[in-house]
Amino acid sequence: MKRVILFLITNLAVMLVLSATLRILGLDRFITAEGLNLNALLMFSLVVGFTGSFISLLISKPMAKYSTGAQVIDPNAPRSQREAWLLDTVYQLADRAGIGRPEVAIYEGAPNAFATGAFKNDALVAVSTGLLESMREEEVAAVLGHEVAHIANGDMVTLTLIQGVVNTFVVFLARVVGYFVDRTIFRTERGVGPGYYVTVIVCEIVFGVLASIIVAWFSRQREYRADAGAAQLLGAREPMIHALARLGGLEPGDLPKSFQASGIAGGGAISALFSSHPPIPARIAALQQMRLS
């Protein structure tokens, strides 16, 4: 699938701006004279949490094009045989998957590819020049099948919903902890003091890191599905296995983190817990064990 710094940065930026805006407008009235209004806080957290993730989803295509410098191929006037082949291959895969034909783009970079877009029938599949130059056609077709499977499986929307849920918990818990720290440690009796805001910021960072582990785990499960989807679309497991094996011997290109989850290669995460992609040997083993329908 591809899905976690551009998506997360955009998501976090929207959350922060929205939080500040709601406070300026006086719409964050979950702290009252009687204490913390948990129902009001939950509603506030839902608005902030889901708005950030959905705005990130809606602008994912233009942000992907901008951040990678991807050039969309004109379907009516491909400039080379390679571009014509890419269009034809992606369109065939999309037709088999039962989705609208996505935009197809090429960007300069080391081996990688990604898919993004808010809707199945209005998506983008992009592949790097490094991948095109280092893989055989059947392997490139498998990678394209993997990306089309991400779109068909609705992985960007799934990631957005998961991100919205974890955002909500991060916003909610950070403010609950901030309130109690401000009351019990800093002894604030009326309203909230500096301790509340400092605690909220620290908790949002800490809880955000923990939440990213959950998002990464879901992303890894969707990667297995996309690998299997590529095999189903191609009618054989071998092209996807060969593509992964070749990718394992290459230095995959970094993507903006927001698109790593929908890329073919991992994002080079420090720990497996934070990786959006399973290890390549595990992905190959899963493909070898699957049954084609």
UniProtKB/Swiss-Prot annotation:
Binds 1 zinc ion per subunit. It is found in: Cell inner membrane. One of its GO terms (biological process) is proteolysis. Its cofactor is Zn(2+). Keywords: Cell inner membrane, Cell membrane, Hydrolase, Membrane, Metal-binding, Metalloprotease, Protease, Transmembrane, Transmembrane helix, Zinc. The active site is at residue 147. Zn(2+) binds at residues 146, 150, 223. GO terms for molecular function: metalloendopeptidase activity; zinc ion binding. One of its GO terms (cellular component) is plasma membrane. It is a multi-pass membrane protein. Gene3D superfamilies: Metalloproteases ('zincins'), catalytic domain (3.30.2010.10). It is an enzyme of class 3 (hydrolase). Pfam families: Peptidase_M48. InterPro entries: HtpX_protease, Pept_M48_protease_HtpX, Peptidase_M48. Its main location: membrane. Its EC number is 3.4.24.-. It comes from the Bacteria. Belongs to the peptidase M48B family. NCBIfam families: PRK05457.1. PANTHER family: PROTEASE HTPX. This is Protease HtpX homolog. It comes from Bordetella avium (strain 197N).
